[in-house]
Amino acid sequence: MEPTFDIPDSTDWLDTPLTLLAPFETSLRCQVCKDFFDNPVITSCSHTFCSLCIRRCLSTEGKCPTCRSSDQELKLRRNWVVQELVEGFKNARPSILQLARMAQTGTDDSGDLAAEEPASKKRKIEPNAIVGTDGLPEEGIRTRSQSRGASRQPQATPVQVIDDGNDEDYMPDGLVPCPVCGRRMKEEAVFRHLDSCTGTAEELKPAAFGSLAPGPRKSFLAATGKPPERLPVINYSLLKDTVLRKKLKDLGIPNWGPRALLQRRHTEWLNLWNANCDSRTPKPKRELLRELDVWERTQGGNSVTPTDPTNAVMNKDFNTEEWSANYDTDFKALIANARKKNDAVIRSTIPNASQANSDTPRSAQLVDQPIEASLTPQDVDEKSTMNPQDAIDNRTEVPPVPDPPQALSGIDRAVNSPMKNVTEGDAQAIPISSSASTHKTPH
């Protein structure tokens, strides 16, 4: 059978006649943890929270959880009135709730009984009742007040049964009581005990170390005699890793893990320690270390994160083909958008990239194509009858070609060479295009 947990909540009053206590109890609960205030403190914006809850919020966001206004940890002040209200209500809550539920049950039962009772409410006197000389009823008849008083009378105390020595199941323990204080002890120790016996029974002492029964817990204030001092907030950006690890070691908390984990661990320890300073009965350090260990296993370095490879396990019934078919359109759209962005980046970084790409085949065609291939038979005849001097003068009409190939190196040598070194054979060796033959320089 699974255990049931009775968690107190403000909605417990809604099923009772005291429904107005529901909003009252809600006002005594923290808006962060939804539990009764524990060491309540008030902020600069006049909102009350648990000391640990508001310190965690301020260390993370620096804002009030209720009104979202900026606040600082140094401005927090203890709210003793709310603490006393919470303690008093927590002590009286079980009794008040029990009485309210009993009243609700009694009201329902009385309504059912009233429906079953007849209209006449006259009482009949029993015939064998005996009436006294003074006119008061005797034991045969009891009035309502007498019945009520009899029900309030305490019942008889239970009779104490003394074991008889003749009982078969009696097992003597070999101890005898002291005739003065009644303490049981061995027979040979009675005489030594009588010399120091005061006549009163000694009170039971708390369990010693190593016993199964735990002794009463002492607070930090009772153990040390002075309240704990608050820890200051430090700027982690000014501390190196070695200094930060040494500071954690001096505080008695773990100093392993990366720098981010060290900062989170130190911040949590500051919140636990300073919140404990707001309590009337501070906890000992070992309990705070136990709470830090719980945080370590749930949110710290020992917690199970979603990035753990042991948890990255796909469902065995997962259908990859169906998933791909359902989201194929989305995948194609993402790929198309990625290509468009890539082309846009290329055009933005190289403005003439598209124009250069379109002109590249034409330039290659002009370079690779021989000049003689573009000549007509008429141009060939004109070339044969052309004056060498005209060919030299028309050399400037040839359009410049960027990065000329080796086939045109002869033209460059002819153009760049001095005029006096040009012979008739060199002039005839220079190929002339159709454009050059049509645009002749007049003499």
UniProtKB/Swiss-Prot annotation:
Q: What is its main location?
A: nucleus
- What processes does the entry annotate via GO biological process terms? DNA repair; mitotic recombination; postreplication repair; protein monoubiquitination
Region annotation (Disordered) ranges: 106-157, 350-443
Note the SS bond partners: none
Q: Which domain of life is it from?
A: Eukaryota
Quote a single Gene Ontology cellular component term: nucleus
Q: Where is the composition biased (Polar residues)?
A: 143-157, 350-363, 431-443
What are the recorded GO MF terms, alphabetically? single-stranded DNA binding; ubiquitin protein ligase activity; zinc ion binding
| Annotated function | E3 RING-finger protein, member of the UBC2/RAD6 epistasis group. Associates to the E2 ubiquitin conjugating enzyme UBC2/RAD6 to form the UBC2-RAD18 ubiquitin ligase complex involved in postreplicative repair (PRR) of damaged DNA.
The name this protein goes by in its record: Postreplication repair E3 ubiquitin-protein ligase rad18
From the broadest rank down, the organism's phylogenetic lineage runs:
Eukaryota, Fungi, Dikarya, Ascomycota, Pezizomycotina
Q: Report the gene name.
A: uvsH
